[in-house]
UniProtKB/Swiss-Prot annotation:
This is Small ribosomal subunit protein uS15. One of the primary rRNA binding proteins, it binds directly to 16S rRNA where it helps nucleate assembly of the platform of the 30S subunit by binding and bridging several RNA helices of the 16S rRNA. Forms an intersubunit bridge (bridge B4) with the 23S rRNA of the 50S subunit in the ribosome. GO terms for molecular function: rRNA binding; structural constituent of ribosome. Keywords: Ribonucleoprotein, Ribosomal protein, RNA-binding, rRNA-binding. Gene3D superfamilies: 6.10.250.3130, S15/NS1, RNA-binding (1.10.287.10). GO terms for biological process: translation. The lineage of its organism: Bacteria, Bacillati, Mycoplasmatota, Mycoplasmoidales, Metamycoplasmataceae.
């Protein structure tokens, strides 16, 4: 889970202003940060299937947002892939 301070910093860094939480780029940034923080937990606890379900939901949500960006704003999509070092 992402703390309020971390979320505020990420929104300020990737958003147009500090209240721009609805921007798809900002949402991808928040989800990517959350996913990266959860990866070590699943490496240490491979049988934690209950939490894995929520983890996979976050990955799917990020994938959906990336598909939206690819369709509607390809320039931001490519920037997103480069910034967060994602494969596509």
């Amino acid at each position: 889970m992402i703390s309020k301070q971390e979320k505020k910093l990420l929104v300020k860094k990737y958003g147009k202003n500090e209240k721009d939480t609805g921007n798809a780029f900002v949402q991808v940034a928040l989800l990517t940060h959350d996913i990266e923080k959860l990866k070590p937990h699943f490496q240490a606890n491979p049988k934690d299937f209950h939490s894995r379900r929520g983890f996979l939901a976050k990955i799917t949500q990020r994938k959906t947002l990336l598909a939206y960006l690819k369709k509607n704003d390809p320039e931001t999509y490519l920037k997103c892939l480069e910034e967060f070092k994602l494969r596509k």
